Amino acid sequence: MHENQQPQTEAFELSAAEREAIEHEMHHYEDPRAASIEALKIVQKQRGWVPDGAIHAIADVLGIPASDVEGVATFYSQIFRQPVGRHVIRYCDSVVCHINGYQGIQAALEKKLNIKPGQTTFDGRFTLLPTCCLGNCDKGPNMMIDEDTHAHLTPEAIPELLERYK
């Protein structure tokens, strides 16, 4: 690569539905930057994650620098920048859940799934991610599987709970 060349981003094209939805969201805001989180969520909902090429495609639609979209994508832990499993498990590792014993939940998840935080099971079924807070502190330890919140967890309940998610 020459010193003035930018690295190549993989070929990526937004679907017509994604582009239309992003343009629709953009019109709700005076500053198109404000629509970047919604645009990222639109792509993630369709594809399961947000590839690098999508950052540039979203930026083009919004008419803003790709670095602005990248900044939003990396700031929000709910935006996935690499492929994830069919079900994403987010367990809370905040101070309150620490006091309430999240470590036992984490250990039970790691044992049952045979993965560490940040990894995806061999069959692509689950991705395990720690999250600083799920906003459910009075009911800890907590975790979310996809959009479902599970509270007052015990390590013993983990195997049965995971069986609900095929």
Curated annotation (Swiss-Prot):
Cofactor: [2Fe-2S] cluster
GO terms of biological process kind: proton transmembrane transport; respiratory electron transport chain
CDD domains given in the database record: TRX_Fd_NuoE
Keyword set, alphabetical order: 2Fe-2S, Iron, Iron-sulfur, Metal-binding, NAD, Quinone, Translocase, Ubiquinone
Signal peptide start-end: none
GO-annotated cellular components: membrane; NADH dehydrogenase complex; plasma membrane; respiratory chain complex I
EC number: 7.1.1.-
Catalytic reaction list: a quinone + NADH + 5 H(+)(in) = a quinol + NAD(+) + 4 H(+)(out)
Domain of life of the source: Bacteria
Gene Ontology MF: a single term: 2 iron, 2 sulfur cluster binding
Residues reported to bind [2Fe-2S] cluster: 92, 97, 133, 137
Binding note for cofactor: Binds 1 [2Fe-2S] cluster.
TM ranges: none
Similarity-based family: Belongs to the complex I 24 kDa subunit family.
Subunit structure: Composed of 13 different subunits. Subunits NuoCD, E, F, and G constitute the peripheral sector of the complex.
Function field: NDH-1 shuttles electrons from NADH, via FMN and iron-sulfur (Fe-S) centers, to quinones in the respiratory chain. The immediate electron acceptor for the enzyme in this species is believed to be ubiquinone. Couples the redox reaction to proton translocation (for every two electrons transferred, four hydrogen ions are translocated across the cytoplasmic membrane), and thus conserves the redox energy in a proton gradient.
Name of this chain's protein: NADH-quinone oxidoreductase subunit E
Gene: nuoE
